Amino acid sequence: MSSARLSTVVLDAHDAHELAGFYVRLLGYEVRADEPDWVLIGPPPGQPGTALAFETEGAYTEPVWPTRRSGDQQMMLHLDIEVDDLDAETARAVAEGARIAEYQPQDDVRVLLDPSGHPFCLWVEATP
């Protein structure tokens, strides 16, 4: 039996504070730690959710997704965020600074790019 537990997902960015602010607004999270090049956010006490951390990386390069070209910075991961109203939450994410990606694979998923270019998906439970 393993005692390992996933506690935090870390995303690099040109500006950790800017990206953390975006996800605080998008997810309703709170700042838990704030350092010059590192910000940790998480859900309010008693709420479910995985913590996110953001690290300033001077050589950060935005990923290209999907890509088939050699040399492009490929996506290393993306966040899936379940929502109740896909259109309303997509509009809210865009108002907070996200961009809608060209690649849209499914009707019940919206692929967006955060202010640092990381892809993330908003999705709703598909109805039968």
Task: Go through each PLM region and give its residues.
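Conserved active-site tyrosine of GNAT-family acetyltransferases
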Residues: Y23-V24, A93, G117
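Vicinal oxygen chelate
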Residues: S2-L6, Y29-H78, T90-L113, E125-P128
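Conserved Rossmann-like nucleotide-cofactor binding loop
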Residues: D84, H118
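Short hydrophobic/aromatic beta-strand micro-patches
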Residues: V10-D12, D80-E82
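N-terminal first-folded block
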Residues: E18-L19, V24-R32
